Amino acid sequence: MSAKTVVFAYHDIGCAGIQALLDSGYDIAAVFTHAHDPKENTFYASVAQLCANNGIAVHAPEDANHPLWIERIAKLDPDYIFSFYYRNLLSEPLLALAKKGAFNLHGSLLPRYRGRAPANWVLVNGETETGVTLHRMVKRADAGAIVAQQRVAIERSDTALSLHGKLRTAASDLLRDALPAMLQGRITETPQDESKATVFGRRTPADGKLVWAQPAEKLFNLVRAVTQPYPGAFCAVGEHKLIVWSAEVVKGNEGQAPGRVISVDPLRIACGEDSLVINAGQRNDNGLYLSGPQLANELGLVDGSLLRGAESGRGPRRTRVLILGVNGFIGNHLSERLLRDERYEVYGLDIGSDAIDRLRSHPRFHFVEGDISIHSEWIEYHIKKCDVVLPLVAIATPIEYTRNPLRVFELDFEENLKLVRYCVKYNKRVIFPSTSEVYGMCQDKHFDEDRSNLIVGPINKQRWIYSVSKQLLDRVIWAYGAKGLNFTLFRPFNWMGPRLDRLDSARIGSSRAITQLILNLVEGTPIRLFDGGEQKRCFTDIADGVEALARIIDNDNDVCNGQIINIGNPDNEASIRQLGEELLRQFEAHPLRSNFPPFAGFRDVESKAFYGAGYQDVEHRKPSIANAKRLLDWTPTVEMRETIGNTLDFFLREAMLEIERPSNKEAC
């Protein structure tokens, strides 16, 4: 019995997988791999060479999920698709081509250690056991039902390289039994226990930094997780870089401060708990592999020297977050959220400060009043100075899309493109606010960041200038990402809450829907429902929204790098008419109700009477939040009724201040 198979493979575990398929009698129609990266330290076998030696067609496409490649694979008519250490996720349309299923070999005991670099992460975390798992592939990475697992013991002497060898052997053993059983239809699949799932992101050379305030055991685990052939654990010594290749833990630190050299022979460094003996290492990236004592001599270390980085004993430097548009709805709430966390320092710029007055005295909040189109030198300096940049400046009120389309383009695209280019120039992480508007008139039930088409109307419908300006900038950022820009795009879905707008903005029509409706209630004018008010939206509480955004800034294990993330509440879907009816109900029950005129009723009007002829509306806009759940461990919790109540209360109290001001002037 044979089965036509398409394989996605890389690394020598990819080679082990291909060899196991051949040994088990599978007919491999094609193999997809990755081209060799000259910047990468290649210590593993070549999938391409193995395929060439066995007469198997091999390809290395930039994007195997491209429709052209999916069409070619469909013509192969595979029974199975296998993935062995292939680095990219395979799309659902591609996986669906396998008549009998698509399966992946993952280097951990799932559901633990899903994601990238599991062999390195288990060592970093001091695990004593790992393994390999063969599982069915589904849309979500590493989440499908388990077919087989092979356990691997981790010895204290193991490094990432030795553990990788063990995993390669375990993979061959597992596949030797599982693949024939699969051909014979003798496998059973066990769903993963999601309550035990953990997810880890990719590791970078910067993750190898030694922080001497940490326990020696933790540093020992880091050293063996990133030792050769990986870039190594490191710290600064004067103007030099000390790379540690081999180390061991010694009990006690002689009462010395973290980072203090206790002795040079052996080279022993005090840690936050116990001490670390450096057996071997090198000076700088191009240095020789040396013993610890010789390394100490080369670096000019003596007993009592203090390694740079020992200042980490006072705690790591705070992350500096630059928020442009800090006085806006998202900016002021996000600043408040970040300032509750000692790890962050916030720098902000905006043309006003009324919404952030409550934050101005905070010692970790630094504000300058200014315009992004004018204060370019200040902005460039602070992008260079800060770690994370959030350009939140935009025109985002629908009437302006038709009333001032060129101004929308100039601010939302041109000015923000300058900010993105500064981030590219200074290699800074940018978290950019895309918008749910980019999905336009998409007909999908749930709008998916990675799958849904972005559909807009004809050119004469100018309301789409905001959507396409944002979409174009999304695409520019994505292209810069391919050249090294660290970015995350987030798409808010109808966030609401206190300080959303000002009632004055609603008076000139330049506000969001709920503010306009509240103004109608406050002034005793009819609530206008455009085109019947049947358009549905998913309303998200600002507290839920900024919590998700704060987690993007946290970026645990770098899981948000290069991602697009919808942030919305699909359970809070309601029409604009339903929004107005709930507002009215809460308005009538509010303690301040008696201060305002009687309700003037609902009135149906054509949208073009308010927005102009260039307007088009969207019937529904519901997000898929699978990415947010998976990457951020985030689920919205605030019900729409509560959000409406909080928003209404804020604006009614603001309206009361307006009512009281004239009498105050007269009293003077």
Curated annotation (Swiss-Prot):
One of its GO terms (molecular function) is UDP-glucuronate dehydrogenase activity. The record marks D142 as: Raises pKa of active site His. One of its GO terms (cellular component) is membrane. One of its GO terms (biological process) is lipid A biosynthetic process. The keyword Lipid metabolism applies. Its EC number is 2.1.2.13, 1.1.1.305. The active site is at H106 (proton donor), E437 (proton acceptor), R621 (proton donor). Keywords: Antibiotic resistance, Lipid A biosynthesis, Lipid biosynthesis, Lipid metabolism, Lipopolysaccharide biosynthesis, Multifunctional enzyme, NAD, Oxidoreductase, Transferase. It catalyses: UDP-alpha-D-glucuronate + NAD(+) = UDP-beta-L-threo-pentopyranos-4-ulose + CO2 + NADH; UDP-4-amino-4-deoxy-beta-L-arabinose + (6R)-10-formyltetrahydrofolate = UDP-4-deoxy-4-formamido-beta-L-arabinose + (6S)-5,6,7,8-tetrahydrofolate + H(+). It comes from the Bacteria. The keyword rRNA-binding does not apply. Pathway: Nucleotide-sugar biosynthesis; UDP-4-deoxy-4-formamido-beta-L-arabinose biosynthesis; UDP-4-deoxy-4-formamido-beta-L-arabinose from UDP-alpha-D-glucuronate: step 1/3; Nucleotide-sugar biosynthesis; UDP-4-deoxy-4-formamido-beta-L-arabinose biosynthesis; UDP-4-deoxy-4-formamido-beta-L-arabinose from UDP-alpha-D-glucuronate: step 3/3; Bacterial outer membrane biogenesis; lipopolysaccharide biosynthesis. (6R)-10-formyltetrahydrofolate binds at R116, V138, K139, R140, A141, D142. PANTHER family: BIFUNCTIONAL POLYMYXIN RESISTANCE PROTEIN ARNA (PTHR43245), UDP-D-APIOSE_UDP-D-XYLOSE SYNTHASE 2 (PTHR43245:SF13). This is Bifunctional polymyxin resistance protein ArnA. It comes from Pseudomonas fluorescens (strain Pf0-1).
